[in-house]
Amino acid sequence: MRAIDTNVLVRLITRDSPNQAASAEAFIEKGAWVPVLALTEAMWVLAAVYERSDADLAVAIEMLLNHKDLILQDSEAVAAALDLFRSRPSVGFSDCLILQMARKAGHLPLGTFDRGLAKIEGTQTV
C-alpha cells in the first residue's frame, strides 16, 4: 500500500489547488496509509497557515478517519484523540494524540509542563 505525506493531506482537505487535489485523489484511489506524524503536521498547517478553527480541524480528522481510501496509522488512538480534542478545546490535537498513544502503549503517566493537558487523567505535571 502507498503512503502519503502532509502536503497530500492538506490538498485533500483544503482543495485550494484543484490540480493538486485531483492528483492527490488519483494517488490514493487504490488506498493509502497515513502516518500519524503526517496527520499531526497537517493539522498544524491547517491551524497556523490556513487559520482553521478547532472545529474545522475536528471535521477534517473525522473525514480522514472515515475516508474509504485512507488507512490512518493507529486509527483507534486517532479516534480517541479526536474525542478528547472535541471535549477539551484548550488542549491541542497533537497533545491529545500523544496522550492516547501513550495510554494505548501502557506508558502512563504522560509527563507534561502543559497546564491544560495536565488536567486530563493519565498525565502528570513535571
Where are the regions that the model predicts?
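Acidic, PIN/NYN-like endoribonuclease modules and their adjacent C-terminal/linker elements
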Residues: 1, 99-126
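Short, well-structured N-terminal submotif of metal-dependent ribonuclease cores
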Residues: 1-34, 49-62
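Histidine- and aromatic-rich ligand-binding microenvironments
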Residues: 4-5, 34, 91-92, 114-115, ...
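Hydrophobic side chains within alpha-helical segments
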Residues: 8-10, 14, 44, 98, ...
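Amphipathic alpha-helical segments within well-ordered protein domains
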Residues: 43-47, 62-65, 82, 99
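Active-site neighborhoods of divalent-metal-dependent phosphate/nucleic-acid chemistry enzymes
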Residues: 69-111
